[in-house]
Amino acid sequence: MAGPGAASSATAPPVLTRGVPVTQTPSHPTALTAAAPRIDTRHELGCTNTATVDEISLNGAPVVDGPAPDKDLAPLSMSVGTTQLWRFVNAATDAFLDLALIDEAGKPVPIQVLARDGSPMIDDAGHPTDSPLTTEPQLVPPAGRIEFLVSAPALDQKVYLVSHAVDTGCTGDSVPERRLGILTALPYTADAAQQAQVPPRTTSPNMFAGLLSRKTEHKRVIAFAEYPRPGDEDQTDFYIAERRPGVALVPYQMNGAPTITVPADSVEEWTVENWTNEVHAFHIHQVHFRVLSVNGQSVVDGALLDTDTVPAATAIAAPPPAAVVPAPRAPVAPASPAPADVTAASQVAPGQVRIKLFFPESLAGDIPFHCHLVDHEDNGMMGVLRVNPRGGRNPP
């Protein structure tokens, strides 16, 4: 990535590269079994969240729940007057993170985002975009990555790396605000200056540059759904399927047929729907996509991503009889009866993320896509996209 090299100059502060992985640890031996967590799908529209808080760590240091003293936080340090490039990966099994830096007074500290999910911030033509300083929290779902520049605080100051609370839906996990680490400054030394001289690096052309200007050749609707396992309502099966006539919900099978087949060098637009009462982390291997809209709201200058958060479904009041609104189509419309506090005049509006994808010839073969909440993935919320070489059959 060109960012580190570009930041090392006579006038710019020196830059170091830091890896900041976050991992999740089970609280007990059965925490990651097929039966955990148990999701009450009988009350899709009126549920109560009783989920516990996931345990996570930062660079191996456990993250403490609730207000944490400085001594219990993962230590982060850098020389005063320098800038570091932090490469942050959310390697937790199902913990969403909403990252920010704040000072001791609770004031946000600006960062400069250079890349998401391993792809530099570029426009559709492949040119680097301006990356202004921002104090906006950065939502990083499981499997998400973000790279950003951080400037050292003063010698007598402390800065906290925090994750703000995330609403994951009424059946989702509990994600409270937590301090992840504490950043302090060390005296500036010549050794630190020499260590910070990162040589410039070049990048190969991005194969997904020009994606937005390509003609869309096919549109699909991809649906997330959850239902109690037949005969065992204590166990939930998770599904991801293309929503079109004749397609049934079937949990992923290792040796099953591909969920979707596309010809190489094709361009598609997917509407990823979430019919459940918790957010999901949509992830596709090998491919980067551009987000076009979220819940109908257009996204401008979105980053190239391979992972994004799909909002939870919501209960909405039925429109007046004169209005014409398409009803949710089977088989992914919620099948369980609504609880007593939800009237028959309500219906479900799925959360939606609309994305654009390109499948180059070099990626011919099978490409998994799935929810990156590992318990969901392991219990069936996964599909396979097959990219046929030129001359292969067209998508169904």
Name what the model sees in each region.
Residues 1:
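Active-site-adjacent, His/Asp/Glu-enriched structural segments that form or flank metal-binding
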Residues 8-11, 28-30, 57, 100, ...:
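Residues in well-ordered beta-strands of folded domains
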Residues 5, 9, 13-46, 205-241:
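Predominantly extracellular/luminal regions of secreted and cell-surface proteins
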Residues 16-20, 31-203, 299-301:
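Histidine- and aromatic-rich segments of cupredoxin/plastocyanin-like copper-binding domains
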Residues 5, 84-85, 269:
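Alpha-helical secondary-structure segments
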Residues 77-80, 206-217, 261-265:
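Surface beta-strand/loop "capping" patches
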Residues 12, 29-31, 82, 90-92, ...:
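Short, flexible loop/turn elements at secondary-structure junctions
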Residues 109-136, 180, 215-396:
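Active-site pocket scaffolds in enzymes
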